[in-house]
């Protein structure tokens, strides 16, 4: 069976991508990164998802990006309730580049030619490393900068959700049997995985379920506006 490395954060998008990779016949090696994120319950969710989906392997790698800083997700910077203009303070400098690089390294070691990630360029917060151009550029890098690439193996970086709305992602998850109750998306999630209901991630998630007409299993400490209007 062909192998793939899948970046599994513990959020809903990465859970759906993991299920998609499995449905395509890949033996999934899930990779989660402990980068110093304040919402550590997301990693607990990744462990649960990997176990329930019965992935072939699950590795958690420590890369402490707090030493670099520059993000509200790692530093003592207030996480805003609403997104503003430009790139938000929740952007983590070079995060997706670093994570994909680690996935690339593991893929080369285990003999996998495919990497999956859950980046999205439709209903997203404006992160530059979620754009299709970035995924295309990284795939080019992967084939230029690896032993297997130079020796002729074509490496592929898959982002199957990049052109889907959050509602469409919810439908994909339902189609593939994903238990969204296992996932954590909130930037301010508490240690038990309860979501704040106010941050941009919570609002996007809640709106996705509402637009999809699917019950939202998220445990919110405060109901997002999109749910209060229903």
UniProtKB/Swiss-Prot annotation:
Alphabetized PANTHER family for the sequence: 7-CYANO-7-DEAZAGUANINE SYNTHASE
The protein's name in its UniProt record: 7-cyano-7-deazaguanine synthase
Organism: Xylella fastidiosa (strain 9a5c)
Cofactor: binding details: Binds 1 zinc ion per subunit.
Residues annotated to bind ATP: 8-18
Pathway in which the depicted protein is active: Purine metabolism; 7-cyano-7-deazaguanine biosynthesis
GO molecular function: ATP binding; ligase activity, forming carbon-nitrogen bonds; zinc ion binding
Residues binding Zn(2+): 186, 196, 199, 202
Top enzyme category: ligase
EC number: 6.3.4.20
Keywords: ATP-binding, Ligase, Metal-binding, Nucleotide-binding, Queuosine biosynthesis, Zinc
Family: Belongs to the QueC family.
InterPro entries membership: QueC, Rossmann-like_a/b/a_fold
Any Gene Ontology biological process: queuosine biosynthetic process
Coiled-coil region: none
Co-factor requirement: Zn(2+)
Catalytic activity line of the entry: 7-carboxy-7-deazaguanine + NH4(+) + ATP = 7-cyano-7-deazaguanine + ADP + phosphate + H2O + H(+)
Keyword field contains Nucleotide-binding: yes
Protein function: Catalyzes the ATP-dependent conversion of 7-carboxy-7-deazaguanine (CDG) to 7-cyano-7-deazaguanine (preQ(0)).
């Amino acid at each position: 069976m062909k192998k793939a490395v899948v970046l599994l954060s513990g959020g809903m998008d990465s859970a759906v991508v993991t299920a998609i990779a499995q449905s395509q016949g890949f033996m999934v090696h899930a990779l989660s990164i402990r980068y110093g994120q304040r919402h550590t319950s997301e990693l607990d969710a990744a462990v649960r998802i990997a176990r329930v989906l019965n992935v072939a392997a699950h590795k958690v790698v420590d890369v402490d990006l707090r030493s670099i800083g520059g993000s509200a997700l790692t530093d003592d910077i207030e996480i805003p309730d609403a997104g503003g203009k430009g790139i938000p303070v929740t952007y983590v400098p070079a995060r997706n580049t670093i994570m994909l690089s680690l996935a690339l390294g593991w893929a080369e070691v285990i003999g996998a030619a495919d990497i999956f990630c859950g980046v999205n360029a439709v209903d997203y917060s404006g992160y530059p490393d979620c754009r299709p151009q970035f995924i295309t550029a990284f795939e080019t890098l992967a084939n230029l900068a690896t032993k297997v690439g130079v020796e002729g193996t074509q490496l592929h970086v898959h982002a199957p959700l990049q052109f889907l709305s959050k509602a469409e992602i919810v439908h994909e998850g339902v189609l593939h049997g994903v238990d969204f109750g296992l996932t954590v998306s909130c930037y301010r999630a508490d240690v038990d995985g309860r979501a704040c209901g106010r941050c941009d991630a919570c609002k996007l998630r809640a709106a996705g379920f509402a637009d999809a007409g699917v019950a939202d299993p998220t445990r919110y400490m405060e109901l997002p506006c999109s749910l209060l209007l229903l």
